From Swiss-Prot:
Keyword Iron-sulfur recorded: no
EC number: 2.7.7.6
Subcellular location, principal: plastid
Gene Ontology molecular-function annotations: DNA binding; DNA-directed RNA polymerase activity; metal ion binding
Descriptive protein name: DNA-directed RNA polymerase subunit beta'
Reaction catalysed by this enzyme: RNA(n) + a ribonucleoside 5'-triphosphate = RNA(n+1) + diphosphate
One GO biological process term: DNA-templated transcription
Classification via InterPro entries: DNA-dir_RpoC_beta_prime, RNA_pol_asu, RNA_pol_N, RNA_pol_Rpb1_1, RNA_pol_Rpb1_3_sf, RNA_pol_Rpb1_clamp_domain
SMART domains, A to Z: RPOLA_N
Pfam entry (one): RNA_pol_Rpb1_1
Keyword Plastid (UniProt): yes
Cofactor note: Binds 1 Mg(2+) ion per subunit. Binds 1 Zn(2+) ion per subunit.
Length: 575
């Protein structure tokens, strides 16, 4: 069995299957009619409203709205069947169902889905054979079409009603046959290349609609699904105030306009007199789906001049449900910060900020504090700074961390390091390690991850550690290469500065290298100062010669700089 996801246009019957339920008493529940208040003074949900317990389920576990059943425990026989309260007709079950149970609003007129108009290519324009601008005018109520009633009276239609009338007159199978005949006879009829391409696009779309058994009427809303209440929460404050999600105000405005149209129809007023209400209902549904169009319009704003957040805005973008909560979910025991150079570190070490380390190793710290019986309450942890530092250092000694630089294109973009606590907010790295990461110190960021299981820790210590990844996998070339800063530093320390300040000064004579280092530390000498150094080459081979004359001792002095001596000493210690 292969699992797959199929995305298709939902039919009105399918929407009713999602939102409507049949009770044991034989009544259908799911239709929303009320929009006055979401919660009453007691904090209970109003019947038929956006948070109705009868439609969406109870707010407390095994407790009904009226209080007839409180913490009711079902028997084994009752668990198989739906249990309803006799008085308030609320299902006695777990409130988790409020996370996924939906309702619906029955719209009095067909409403256009704005997403089908804004998409490119516009499928409504291809099906109806009308221009996009004209369809948008019909959608906004600026244009209209005239039809005749049964009594042969002219009637003006706009918005969803007009497009619904145009779509109802199109026969899918007959139009497909006509289009295929036009393609076969394109030479005789002298069809242009543009028209030929348009006909091909229509045939592709019509074939897809026939294969998937989609009807044109499904492109319009008849039943508007309402999201579960826990997705759009509401909170009662102490000062009789309510904090509500933006979607609740949008749903409430749709119900208000829809109820107004129902009352006007019941009062037998002709349809031409409440066209404005129909256009307003279309705008309200558009705001619910996508509110970007109404940025400058007063309809899309609330009292504090803040734009209401629509469904598409909740889904799309970095802060949307899909990227933030489903795909790009932030992982626990991880962090991110800017990298900074630190040449004093070893190749297998990295500098980790103290604040970040406390947050990353927080559970480990609590575990140690509970073992030592030093703390009882969690909020007092940050006050014990001295003990905290000692515990944190003991934890870090035996715990390697993983550093990742995005984009992770190959294996060497993730390597393990032994952390060392540092002051500041940046991660510190040895410059020789950066070539494997393809990182520079110009604002690059790295992610920190902690391996938790014993297998992950062993893999980090043996395989992922930076010392064991010195060569590239593709050709065996060394990854630990001197970067721009190191090459520039080597050049700067070995260069002879021929400035008059250095040349005209008296060149001092030294017989010992340690004296030169001491003078450099005392800042009596700079890197570019010229000096004479007594050079004793121990590996030089001399021939033995016996002469009668007095023996002459040969002393060699080399003119060099302080920087070259220090550089030579570093290489000698390394080798």
């Amino acid at each position: 069995m292969r699992d797959y996801v199929k995305i298709n246009i939902a039919s009105p019957k399918q929407i009713l299957k999602w939102t409507e339920r049949l009770t044991p008493k034989g009544k259908y529940i799911g239709k929303l009619k009320n929009s006055k208040k979401t919660l009453d003074k007691k904090g209970k949900c109003i019947r038929g409203g956006l948070f109705c317990e009868q439609i969406f389920g109870p707010t407390k576990k095994n407790t009904c709205r009226c209080g007839y059943y409180k913490n009711y425990k079902k028997s084994k026989k009752e668990k198989k069947h739906i249990k309803l309260c006799r008085i308030c007709n609320v299902e006695i079950t777990d409130p988790i169902i409020r996370n996924y149970r939906m309702g619906y609003i029955e719209l009095n007129i067909p409403i256009i889905n704005i997403l089908y108009l804004n998409i490119n290519p516009c499928y409504l324009a291809i099906i109806t054979n009308l221009k996009i601008n004209y369809l948008k005018q019909l959608h906004s109520g600026k244009a209209y079409i005239t039809i005749k009633d049964k009594n042969q009276k002219e009637k003006k239609l706009t918005g969803g009603e007009a497009i619904n009338d145009i779509l109802s007159k199109i026969d899918l199978e007959k139009t497909l046959i006509k289009l295929t005949n036009n393609i076969h006879q394109y030479k005789e009829k002298n069809i242009t290349i543009k028209n030929f391409k348009n006909i091909l696009n229509k045939i592709k779309l019509y074939n897809y609609l026939l294969q998937t058994k989609i009807k044109f009427s499904w492109l319009l809303f008849k039943y508007l699904p309402v999201l579960p209440p826990n997705v759009r929460p509401i909170i009662n404050m102490k000062n009789n105030q309510q904090i509500s999600n933006d979607l609740n105000t949008l749903y409430a405005s749709i119900i208000n306009v829809n109820n107004k149209i129902i009352k006007l129809k019941e009062s037998l007023i002709p349809d031409n007199y409440f066209i404005n209400e129909k256009i307003l209902l279309q705008k309200k549904v558009d705001q619910l789906i996508n509110n970007e169009k109404y940025k400058e319009n007063k309809l899309g704003k609330i009292i504090n001049n803040k734009k209401l957040k629509s469904i598409t805005e909740n889904i799309k973008g970095k802060e949307g449900i899909i990227r933030e909560n489903m795909l790009g979910k932030t992982v626990n025991f991880s962090g991110r910060s800017v990298i900074v150079v630190e040449p004093t570190l070893n190749l297998n070490e990295c500098g980790l900020p103290k604040e970040m380390a406390i947050n990353l190793f927080y559970p480990f710290i609590i575990k140690e504090l509970i073992k030592l019986k030093l703390i009882k309450r969690l909020y007092k942890i940050k006050k014990i700074t001295k003990i905290l530092d000692i515990i944190l250092e003991n934890i870090i000694k035996n715990h390697y961390i993983l550093l990742n630089r995005a984009p992770t294109l190959h294996r060497l973009n993730i390597q393990a390091f032994q952390p060392k606590l540092t002051i500041g907010k940046s991660i510190k790295l040895h410059p020789l390690v950066c070539s494997a990461f393809n990182a520079d110190f110009d604002g690059d960021q790295m992610g920190v991850h902690i391996p938790l299981s014993l297998k992950a820790q062993a893999e980090a210590r043996n395989i992922l550690i930076s010392i064991n990844n010195c060569n590239s996998l593709k050709n065996g070339d060394p990854n630990i290469l001197p970067s721009q800063d190191i090459i520039l530093g080597c050049y700067f320390s070995n260069i002879e500065n021929c400035n008059l300040l250095y040349i005209l000064n008296k060149i001092q004579i030294y017989t010992n290298m340690e004296k030169i280092k001491m003078e450099y530390k005392k800042e009596n000498l700079s890197i570019h100062n010229f000096i004479w150094l007594n050079f004793k080459n121990k590996q030089q081979i001399d021939k033995l010669k016996i002469k009668r004359k007095n023996l002459i001792k040969k002393i060699i002095f080399l003119r060099t700089t302080v920087g070259r001596i220090l550089f030579n000493d570093i290489i000698k210690n390394f080798l």
